[in-house]
Amino acid sequence: MKLKQIALGVFAALLLASCGNKANEPEAKTQTSDTWQEIKPQEIDVNAVKMFADDWMLLSAGKDTSMNMMTIAWGGLGELWGKPVVTIYVSTDRYTYKFLEENEYFTVTAFPEQYRDKLQYLGSVSGRDEDKVKGSGLTPEFTKLGNPIYKEANLAIECKKLYAEPLNKDLMPLEQRQWYDEKKQGVHVMYIGEIVNVWKK
């Protein structure tokens, strides 16, 4: 009988000790898909041609009080003057052009395929005519520098403008010159931005 009582006592002590240790352990930190992870520009592991041309990206400029966004397929990633850069092309006719001219920074964000219809919408309407944030249903977030990215995105690249230059129609191949003439639209401006921050999910 005494042996049973001793055994039960030892078991209870071990059980209490085990529970006490677990109570003192720090909770495990979990990373969810809703949490941004900061990475280096060199760690952007994507096919840039596919990301722009096929999947599309969302270009945004401005601050929380006044901003605009548009879907883009013309662009690229690379290096200039020893800096990692994003290059984009925006027509002077686009409403976003005004925001690019007035602000020092811009962002480009990529989205999962399920948001394709949102990008289609954002590339087909103008912020002059309607509230594109409300119409798209996307959720703007703002970086420490005050620039817009989106909760639904899975890659966000924040850029500081380095250089801007309108494309020269006289230097274009004939086919491209005719394209601009037929569409009767403003020429595209090339913007090169230094990548200052990158986040992914």
State each model region's role.
Residues 15-18:
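C-terminal motif of bacterial Sec signal peptides marking the signal peptidase cleavage site
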Residues 20-201:
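Active-site-proximal mixed secondary-structure blocks
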Residues 1-7:
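Bacterial N-terminal signal peptides that target proteins for export
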